[in-house]
Amino acid sequence: MRGLLCWPVLLLLLQPWETQLQLTGPRCHTGPLDLVFVIDSSRSVRPFEFETMRQFLMGLLRGLNVGPNATRVGVIQYSSQVQSVFPLRAFSRREDMERAIRDLVPLAQGTMTGLAIQYAMNVAFSVAEGARPPEERVPRVAVIVTDGRPQDRVAEVAAQARARGIEIYAVGVQRADVGSLRAMASPPLDEHVFLVESFDLIQEFGLQFQSRLCGKDQCAEGGHGCQHQCVNAWAMFHCTCNPGYKLAADNKSCLAIDLCAEGTHGCEHHCVNSPGSYFCHCQVGFVLQQDQRSCRAIDYCSFGNHSCQHECVSTPGGPRCHCREGHDLQPDGRSCQVRDLCNGVDHGCEFQCVSEGLSYRCLCPEGRQLQADGKSCNRCREGHVDLVLLVDGSKSVRPQNFELVKRFVNQIVDFLDVSPEGTRVGLVQFSSRVRTEFPLGRYGTAAEVKQAVLAVEYMERGTMTGLALRHMVEHSFSEAQGARPRALNVPRVGLVFTDGRSQDDISVWAARAKEEGIVMYAVGVGKAVEAELREIASEPAELHVSYAPDFGTMTHLLENLRGSICPEEGISAGTELRSPCECESLVEFQGRTLGALESLTLNLAQLTARLEDLENQLANQK
């Protein structure tokens, strides 16, 4: 009958199962495979027949390459119900699978084959049970072993399983219904339907089934993995190597016979093995001598094409230029520039650092004197001010630059008289949102403020400067946040640091801040927009807007900011002109000078008008 493999009792013509189990060498290598056995354990299967089926399963396992990345095996048994013996994910060792099969107890009820196929399709071959995902394209194979006619329908559910990519082998024993076997199996039927006359012959089917899974010529299939040569044998193979090589421990790779390992090569640096021979090789930056064993360093500087401005140093990787002390190598790798110690060291200058050869010195602004420590300058007169710093923490600033901003803020704090009665300092960071790092009333000393500044964490994200200005106006200068009452006439100063264009509108709250009497300063770095800086700052912009091309040069702004933020306590009604080096006196001096100029300008205009009137009268008399 076409499509049906009958197994007559011709044991002498077939190799016994036990002989197959004793074969040595590599096991069957089918590649990755998800294999589920569906075993009929209904009451019609007698105990000794079930034991034969148990031995059949264990024998078939011994011929498979079992492992998480090779063949995964699951077993289910069924009668009137379905029971999972072990899923695909349960075991990766053959010994554990055999132990579970030995403990298998038959269910001894009806024969619901369709129910078993449905369970295999929906549960046993699910990813949760250990089947590999469909995108990995690992074949899914079900082997159904039954001895009777199903008591439910199998054709429709088997078709669904095949449509999901499950390849079905149907093995019938003794009284099995041939029509049901054909309805379950995958095409071509003559390769997927087997009929065994008795349980005694089911082991002989195992040989044929294993041969069908494994193929006959593993070397020809190309999956053997031999590096040099594959020698095929029945259901097995072994690898050999070309002359001059030996087989590695994995029995697939080939290693050159290492003549270098004998230690008689005489190579100064490296010995490189080749089939039947060897040669010497030097490290990078060295050349092999005529004796083909010793090595000499290459003097790249002697070639005369290094173009180094100061000195050339030969290294194994090639020529390297080196600069004399007090100079730094430039990005071109050749030229040298005098080192700017002010940018390269923590100089500690309060105002300005000036590099001088291999050293540096600190400078103070006009009207202020350098102190004995050679770094600090005498302070402006102590005064009262509430100062809120708005710091841009957007992603464009970047973490390393944010640290420079914090250092810059602390340099401003250094020249302030920080105390509850003197200058109070608050800090707000903004990006896509606004966060008060510490309010005006929290810290009473400069040391506490500086420590809190260093602890501020970088926010990243966007640049909502308008939102930050609103927060400052509505919250930061409130008495609840530590600002002093307006009745005390303590100046309120806002200082904004930003490096880019705001992502929201700033005009409303920039104007509102000035209406509230807040003196606004704007410090821009890098790509900061000048128009926005001017809109934020108070008038005149020349005194309230500062700009630096990058974060590394912000320290040059300190002198102007220190002179500008120094508090004003109001102009005295007296006419005495005090030293303009003091902030209050300087403002008073400038104010009175501007007032005098305005008065002179008005008088000049009036005098000019009177002269024009006299000229007109004289012209009329003539």
Curated annotation (Swiss-Prot):
Main location: secreted
Gene3D superfamilies: 1.20.5.30, Laminin, von Willebrand factor, type A domain
Protein name: Matrilin-4
GO cellular component: collagen-containing extracellular matrix; extracellular region; matrilin complex
Organism: Homo sapiens
Coiled coil: 591-622
Gene name of the record: MATN4
Alphabetically ordered keywords of this record: Coiled coil, Disulfide bond, EGF-like domain, Glycoprotein, Repeat, Secreted, Signal
Location of the EGF-like domain: 215-255, 256-292, 297-337, 342-377
Domain VWFA: 34-213, 386-561
GO terms for biological process, alphabetical: extracellular matrix organization
Domain of life: Eukaryota
